[in-house]
Amino acid sequence: MPKIPAINPLLQAWLLEGPLSAQVPAYVERLRRGRYATHTSSRWLNGVAHFAHWMSMCHIPVHMLDEGCIDQFLRYHLPRCDCLGGALRTPMELHAALVPVLEILRAEGVIARAPAPTGPIADELSRYDAHMSSARGLAAGTRRGRLRIIERLLLSKFA
């Protein structure tokens, strides 16, 4: 198992003994491959530990996780959170830390892939992505960022 950055012992127990313990090595490896700073890695692991503790308290099995669970955690648990151990409570940082967990779970086949969006806006975004890739030669990360912006524009104007 990759070396885990230093976090509070209580949080480390939540992380290594909780429902997401099987995904911790892949998560730590992802942080290492992404060359995240030690401070960021520690904070994100803190956030994953906090989420794992909440999952345990709510008896949510790993195979039931999806974006809705993360939203529920952020909207309903955080505002009244009294968890110990200096648990991370910053919604934006927690969201950033938890999205990769879903990606790892999907890659491992633990949870189903998110359904592909459908409809005219999704079709237009797909065509625009193909154009940015083939005609413009843009990298995947650049395309994702631009697609998020265009999606918000299209949704605000046409949805």
Locate the predicted segments by residue.
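Non-catalytic DNA-binding core/recognition domains of DNA-processing enzymes
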Residues: P2-I7, V24, G34-G109, L138-A159
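Intrinsic, low-complexity N-terminal interaction/targeting segments
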Residues: L11, L16-P19, A116-P120, E124-S126, ...
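Helix-boundary capping/turn motifs
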Residues: E17-A26, R43-G47, E124-L125
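Amphipathic alpha-helical segments within well-ordered protein domains
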Residues: V28-R32, A52, D129-S133
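Charged interaction scaffolds used for protein-protein
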Residues: V110-A114
